Amino acid sequence: MSLVAESNSGTISEQELDKVQLYSDLCLYEEALTKLVDSVDNFKPQLEIGKQLIEADKKLYSTLDLLPQYDSVFTRLRTLDDEISKVDQQTKNILSILNECHDDLNALPLLEEVEFEKKMILKQREKIKSNVLLEYATKLAKFTKIPPTFDKGTIGPNNFIWPAEDALRKGMLAMASLHGKELTKLPGQEDGEEDGSTANEDKNIVKDAEGAEGEIRQDDKKEDDSFVFGANANDAEGDEDKNAGEDEDEAMDSDLDLFNPDEF
C-alpha cells in the first residue's frame, strides 16, 4: 500500500479514492519512483522505469490544475457535514419531544372514561347531601342553633322559616289593592271601554257625593230649626212646669188632689 493510501485509510475508503483522478495519478507517480529507487539500490537501473516516472510526472502536473475544484468540493463537503450534524441534532430533539408527548398522551384517560366520570359527577350533583341542606336551612332560619330556652315539645309558627298566614293574607290584599283594575277587568273588555266605564263610574260617584252633601246640608238646616223649635218648647215646658207647680200647691192646699195631667 502506498503512503498516500495509508494516510487516508482512516477517513475515506480506498475504492472511493480510486475514483479521484488526482489520487490515482499520485499513486502511479509513487509506484514509478519506488521502482526506480529499488533498481538503483540493486545497481541495476532500468531506462523503462525512468520513462514511466516521467510520464506519471507529466500526467500529475496536468491533473494539478483540477486542485482548486477539488478544494471547493472538499469545502462544500465539510459544510454539508456540519449541516448534517445540525439536522441530526434537531431530529434527536424532535424525537425526544415526540416521545415526551407520547408519554403524556398515554397518561391521559380515555374518552370513554372521561364521559363515564362526567355522568357520575352529574348524578352526584343531582343528589343533595343532608349537611349541605342543613347549612342552607340555618342561613334561612332565624336561629343557627337551638336557643337554650326553647322547648322542643312546643312548635309554633313564630319559629318557622316561612311567613305566617296573616302575613300571606296581608301580602295578597296589598297586591290586590295595587292591581285592582286588572283584577276587576272583564275578560272581553278592552282598555278604552274600561276607561269609559271607569269615567262613568267616577261621574256617578261625584253625583252621588254631591247629592249626599245636599242631603246633609238639608238635614243640618232641619236640625238647626228643630233645635230652635226645641229650645222654644223647652221654655214653654218650663213655664208650664212653673204653673203646674203653683196648681199643685193650690191643690194640696185645697183638697189634696195629687193627679197632674201634664205628667202623662
UniProtKB/Swiss-Prot annotation:
Pfam families: Med4 (PF10018). Keywords: Activator, Nucleus, Transcription, Transcription regulation. GO terms for cellular component: core mediator complex; mediator complex. Residues 200-225 have a biased composition (Basic and acidic residues). InterPro entries: Mediator_Med4. It comes from the Eukaryota. One of its GO terms (molecular function) is transcription coregulator activity. Residues 236-264 have a biased composition (Acidic residues). GO terms for biological process: cellular response to heat; positive regulation of transcription elongation by RNA polymerase II; positive regulation of transcription initiation by RNA polymerase II; RNA polymerase II preinitiation complex assembly. Residues 183-264 are annotated as: Disordered. It is found in: Nucleus. Component of the Mediator complex, a coactivator involved in the regulated transcription of nearly all RNA polymerase II-dependent genes. Mediator functions as a bridge to convey information from gene-specific regulatory proteins to the basal RNA polymerase II transcription machinery. Mediator is recruited to promoters by direct interactions with regulatory proteins and serves as a scaffold for the assembly of a functional preinitiation complex with RNA polymerase II and the general transcription factors. Belongs to the Mediator complex subunit 4 family. Component of the Mediator complex. This is Mediator of RNA polymerase II transcription subunit 4. It comes from Candida glabrata (strain ATCC 2001 / BCRC 20586 / JCM 3761 / NBRC 0622 / NRRL Y-65 / CBS 138) (Yeast).
